[in-house]
UniProtKB/Swiss-Prot annotation:
Pathway: Cofactor biosynthesis; biotin biosynthesis; biotin from 7,8-diaminononanoate: step 2/2. This is Biotin synthase. Its EC number is 2.8.1.6. It comes from Aromatoleum aromaticum (strain DSM 19018 / LMG 30748 / EbN1). Homodimer.
């Protein structure tokens, strides 16, 4: 397996691996808030520059028409969200988006497709996208659903740096959100990605109605992998009208920060990414998340079908906080 790019390598030596239990993770969540943030910041400073944030840009290369029933997703054909199905983008169009992302300061370009998994007929186009984006000097990432056969090896040969496939939530809550594929299916794809020598990007979504134990359980699943993900995106649910989760109660903001802090402590050398939901966060809440150990964001005004802060707002926030790009 190839080593992670310099931007993703921790500055400090690797720490001994800890196998977490759900009980231990819950106890971590239950620490006094200030104690938890202090511990998370200590861990963060031991492995990363505390004032540096990695920036990724995410583009939907194929929108809508997905056969799966993920309860949070606007792109499922099983939900009445009013989203039209679109065809796979042309390679040249993707390259133009990637050039714009690089010009604005992104170091990684992520490409997402709404389907259960890529069909063979679409793979050559996706592989060409990876090769062309890589040639721009950007790190490449794709999120294509479940892989089969030698697709992971094909992506590796094309130059793919990262593959995103989130676990979404804890095992005991998973069936309340998704029924068309299992958590085991997701883990199988991640094993294929690891086996091909591609860096793993995997995290989850909070605020879907799960309890603290399930949030802790998600992090345990991630932290206890043979090799924890190099990138761990933590999404704060953005309820979409027409989906089963459109009326779910919002997670308490401090509980979201606790989740970030626990992720940092449990996966000390992983990049922890603030993902979906930043548009709804105040600058102050985001600052707390950075204090808790988040050191990566999605950069740009769109995340697949969800709004994201525009780059001007992010640049203003980074200036106020003294944060700089990786």
């Amino acid at each position: 397996m190839t080593s992670a790019p310099a931007a993703e390598r921790p500055a400090a030596p690797a720490v001994p691996r800890i196998k977490w239990t759900v009980v231990e993770a819950v106890e971590l969540f239950e620490q006094p808030f200030m104690d938890l943030l202090f511990r998370a910041q200590q861990v963060h400073r031991a492995h990363f520059d505390p004032n540096a944030v990695q920036r990724s840009t995410l583009l939907s290369i194929k929108t809508g028409g997905c056969s799966e029933d993920c309860g949070y997703c606007s792109q499922s054909t099983r939900h009445n969200t009013g989203l039209d199905r679109e065809q796979l983008l042309k390679v040249a169009e993707v390259v133009e988006h990637a050039k714009a992302a690089k010009a604005k300061g992104a170091s990684r370009f992520c490409m997402g497709a709404a389907w259960r998994g890529p069909k063979d007929k679409d793979m050559e186009t996706v592989l060409a996208m990876v090769r062309e984006v890589k040639a721009l000097g950007l790190e490449t990432c794709v999120t294509l659903g479940m892989l089969k056969g030698d697709q992971a090896l094909q992506l590796k040969e094309a130059g793919l740096d990262y593959y995103n496939h989130n676990l979404d939530t804890a095992p005991e809550f998973y069936g309340q959100v998704i029924t068309t594929h299992t958590l085991a299916d997701r883990l199988d794809t991640l094993e294929q990605v690891r086996g091909a020598g591609i860096n793993v990007c995997s995290g989850g979504i909070v605020g879907m109605g799960e309890g603290r134990r399930s949030r802790a359980g998600l992090l345990v699943q991630l932290a206890n992998m043979a090799s924890p993900p190099e990138s761990v995106p933590i999404n704060n649910l953005v309820p979409v009208p027409g989906t089963p989760l459109e009326n779910v109660d919002k997670i308490d903001p401090f509980e979201f920060v606790r989740t970030i802090a626990a992720a940092r402590i449990m996966m000390p050398t992983s990049f922890v990414r603030l993902s979906a939901g930043r548009q709804q966060m105040s600058d102050e809440l985001q600052a707390l998340c950075f204090m808790a150990g988040a050191n990566s964001i999605f950069y740009g005004d769109r995340l697949l079908t969800t709004d994201n802060p525009d780059t001007d707002r992010d640049e203003a926030l980074f200036a106020r906080l003294g944060l700089r790009p990786v």
